[in-house]
Amino acid sequence: MYKVIFDSINSTQDEIIGFNNYKKILKNNNLYIQSFRQIKGTGRGKKKWSSPIGNIYLTINQKLKASYALRNNFYICYIIHKFFKINFNINLDYKWPNDLFLKNKKIAGVVVKSTILGKKSYLKTGIGININNSPIVDSVSLFGIINKKSNILDLSNIIIDFIEHSLTKKISNKKLVRYLNKYMIRDFKLNHPIFGKNIIEILSVNEDLSLKIKIDDTIKNIFFGELV
């Protein structure tokens, strides 16, 4: 494992080295890029992630089989959820496909960018976790839950070690999906390019990690879209 840390950067998902050297590093190691502040942090699609000093912003760079690329987003959410449960006795709620909430307020988000070359994928998994600040109205921080400020560098090192250890473990899709369904929030509307903005019934995450919904008395499986 390698880690690079910045005081400030546009985004931890930015390229900091040439792609050939990047591939060499990822041949045998994961690369973690962290910054205490992001100037242009991004979420899913064109969304911006407010990134003031006091929270954790990092990107995990990995080389995986191309077939694992889709799953990684969900697995990282699962790992972060487990971290909060084990270390703080906090059971977060899961919002498909890549956010974690507590009492309807967002505390963490995951966004993945991938480059697929043949059977290999190079993944940049961005993670934002509200630790000492909750930068938007509908968000919450760890400080807001436990009423205690955290040292960002110390806590991020603990989280990275937890993630790195967890990534060495095998977990079946069945177990992952069962876990996600257990904690999934189901009271969102759908914003989707095909189905539009409709009131839906969220049923479950399928084993292929699509979302099963009910719309106009019809069951649909969607692989992308936004819950709002």
Feature annotation, model-predicted:
Residues 42-44, 95, 220:
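Basic side chains
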Residues 31, 91-95:
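A short coil-to-beta-strand element that immediately follows conserved catalytic motifs
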Residues 3-5, 14, 24, 65-68, ...:
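Long, positively charged amphipathic alpha-helical accessory segments at protein N-termini or as interdomain linkers
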Residues 1-86:
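N-terminal lobe of the biotin/lipoate ligase/transferase fold
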